[in-house]
Amino acid sequence: MTAKSIKEAVLRDPTDFGDVDYPTALVNVTNVCNLSCSHCFVFRDNNPNSARDKMDDATMMRQFEILRDKHNIKSMLFMGGEPMIRKDLVMEAAKLFDIPAIVTNATYGIPKLPGGLVTVSLDGPEQMNDPIRG
């Protein structure tokens, strides 16, 4: 498949990345965040990923199942914005994958993710971190 044909296929069906297995994938479950970090793509001017209408949880769960089954995805990385704003969705979707992972700012707590990976984003010691985080 060419880049153009992949793009056209994805526009028709968001789970169509060709007839290929992908061991790992990532998804931004939301572009909403409770912080306003100076370096974050969510808060850049003219960001095409800015917060807007979200996919409802049931639809997103179906998409996760389709992606897992269609592309044999074993590991899923949940990102955002702040993915734990949609904690119920993320924790339920994490059960679908052998190796779930979450990137979080930990302001909603650090989730328990047995068999998975939780990455907490920090920008240095408190005196450096806090001004960056807004």
List where the protein language model places each region.
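Radical SAM/AdoMet-radical enzyme domain recognition
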Residues: M61-I66, K70-F78, R86-G134
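Phosphate-binding glycine-rich loops and adjacent basic patches that engage nucleotide phosphates
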Residues: A3, D21-V29, R52-D56, N105-P111, ...
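Canonical Radical SAM [4Fe-4S] cluster-binding loop centered on the CxxxCxxC motif
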Residues: D16-T59, H71
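Radical SAM enzyme core and accessory elements
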Residues: M1-D19
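A short alpha-helix capping/helix-coil boundary motif
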Residues: I6-K7, V42-F43, P125-E126
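A short, structure-level motif marking secondary-structure boundaries and short turns
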Residues: L11-R12, P48-S50, S75, D130
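Short secondary-structure boundary micro-motifs
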Residues: A9-T15, D53-K54, T59-M61, L67, ...
